[in-house]
Regions:
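Hydrophobic membrane-insertion alpha-helices, especially the h-region
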Residues: 1-8
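Non-catalytic architectural context of zinc metalloproteases
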Residues: 8-57, 157, 161-172, 188-190, ...
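Generic alpha-helical secondary structure signal
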Residues: 30, 41-43, 48, 63, ...
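Auxiliary, metal-adjacent structural segments of Zn-dependent hydrolase domains
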Residues: 42-103
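Active-site-flanking segments in enzyme catalytic domains
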Residues: 82-244
Length: 244
């Protein structure tokens, strides 16, 4: 029985080849949590468990297919050092699909939350990484230029942690200037939602741009900023397969 348990444990935490290649390509440390995990940052604690082997293999393929769309220079510009993959990831006890730990230059991603929807998990890869970009740029939550694009009567909520209800991330054309209910929760979430859906739901976003001048202006500002932040995120990127 002991031998069997050890064998199962080894299989449970084996690093999928696709994640190994991500680490090599982007010069980042990629880890899979292999025991109950806890890390405390400035005012918050992240906890996670070991993912099941089948969940890990499935997620690793999805994650790698999305991450490989980024130019190597973009990951360096974001100052990302580590990617940690786990299950049941929580931030101060609140379950999360992913968490950016800014002071640790680390991204955490959950293999199982939302795994009923591949498009959702794909979008999360980009949404949460964008927070890292925004933080490096110094405009995560205070962004007067972005806020000025909204209608005068528009007001954001008190943050994404306050909006965790099912369906908050569903695309809708019922909200002028934003893509989802979740985007209304905070300026940082508005930007991240737009970036994530540009990469995963490009046709939908372009359709909204034609009918909503605020969204069109936000896309223009977002792309312009990204091009200045990293020269590889340019028109050629957005017109390539990687950007679509």
């Amino acid at each position: 029985m002991v031998g069997l348990a050890v064998s199962l444990l080894v299989r449970l935490v084996r690093m999928p080849d696709s994640l190994v290649e991500i680490g090599k390509k982007y010069s980042v440390q990629v880890e899979v949590i292999d025991s109950p995990y806890s890390w405390t940052g400035r005012g918050y604690t992240i906890k996670a468990d070991t993912p099941q082997a089948t969940d890990l293999e499935k997620y690793a393929w999805l994650f790698a297919s999305e991450w490989n769309r980024y130019p190597i220079s973009a990951i360096k510009s974001a100052k990302l050092k580590r990617i940690i993959i786990g299950a049941n990831i929580s931030l101060n006890g609140q379950i999360r699909a992913a968490v950016p730990a800014f002071e640790a230059n680390t991204m955490y991603y959950d293999t199982t939350l939302g795994n009923y929807s591949a498009p959702y998990q794909r979008m999360v890869v980009h949404h949460e990484f964008f927070h890292m970009i925004d933080q490096v740029e110094g405009i995560l939550r205070k962004d007067s230029e972005w806020a000025a694009l909204n209608a005068p009567e528009f007001h954001y909520g008190s943050g994404g942690e306050k909006v965790r209800n099912l369906g908050a991330g569903v695309l809708t054309d019922k909200l002028p200037g934003v893509l989802t209910v979740y985007a209304m929760s905070g300026i940082e979430e508005d930007k991240a939602e737009l970036f994530g859906h540009l990469l995963v739901d490009r046709d939908y976003v372009e359709g909204r741009m034609k009918a909503d001048s605020v969204i069109a202006a936000k896309v223009g500002l977002l792309k312009g900023r990204l091009g200045k932040w990293d020269a590889a995120i340019n028109d050629e990127f957005w017109n390539s397969k990687a950007g679509q």
